[in-house]
Regions:
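Surface-exposed coil/turn segments at beta-strand junctions on protein surfaces, enriched
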Residues: 87, 143-145, 167
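Short glycine-rich, acidic/polar surface loops and turns
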Residues: 97-99, 135-141
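A short, acidic, flexible beta-alpha connecting loop/helix-capping segment that sits on the rim
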Residues: 155-160
Length: 180
């Protein structure tokens, strides 16, 4: 082989982000994002370890988890017969945020409102881009040097009844260390 190793699967991640300043101001911006992930065997029949699959929900600070605010960490996606999340081979998510800079000096403070939709699917054949779990919410971001970004979000997951059988409610999410 060209490179050493015995991995017989391919995991592909795609992310597109777009920022647009609004009202000719450096204090108001629109941020949009689209995430897509796919994992499959190169050699058919090769087992893929469960930690390599895609998981979704929460703030995304849990390893290998696509963030979807308004839902618990790793709560969105395929489940086994006893209701445990098993992860999926396909992840898709879109989102939009409207960001407002309250202060830029000495410590930048931003307020935001967001809308997101996403899901994890067992396989490419079972992927349905119209079967998304939706959420909206509000948040705040502080950019503290040299610590980095600290964020607080309240998200409302409209489809929690489908995801975990519970009524929709506002959930708090803490962000740390990720930039805009």
């Amino acid at each position: 082989p060209f490179l050493p190793g015995d991995v017989d699967y391919l995991k592909t991640l795609f992310k597109a982000e777009w920022y647009k300043r609004l009202f000719n101001s450096n204090r108001v911006a629109l941020y949009t994002v689209a995430d897509f992930g796919y994992i499959d065997e190169i050699v058919r029949g090769t087992p893929i370890q469960p930690f390599e699959f895609f998981y979704m929900g929460g703030n995304g600070l849990v390893i290998a988890t696509v963030p979807l605010r308004g839902y618990e960490d790793r709560s969105v996606g395929p489940r086994n017969a006893v209701g445990q999340i098993i992860g999926g081979r396909v992840a898709a998510k879109i989102g939009a945020e409207l960001r407002f800079a309250v202060t830029l000096e000495p410590i930048p403070l931003y307020l935001l409102t967001f809308a997101e939709a996403g899901n994890v699917f067992e396989s490419f054949e079972k992927t349905d881009i119209f079967d998304m779990r939706r959420s909206v919410g509000v948040g705040a971001r502080l950019l503290i040097n040299p610590i980095g970004l600290i964020g607080f979000d309240f998200g409302y997951g409209f489809d929690r009844k489908i995801v975990d059988g519970r009524d929709p409610e506002w959930l708090f999410h803490f962000q740390f260390g990720r930039g805009f």
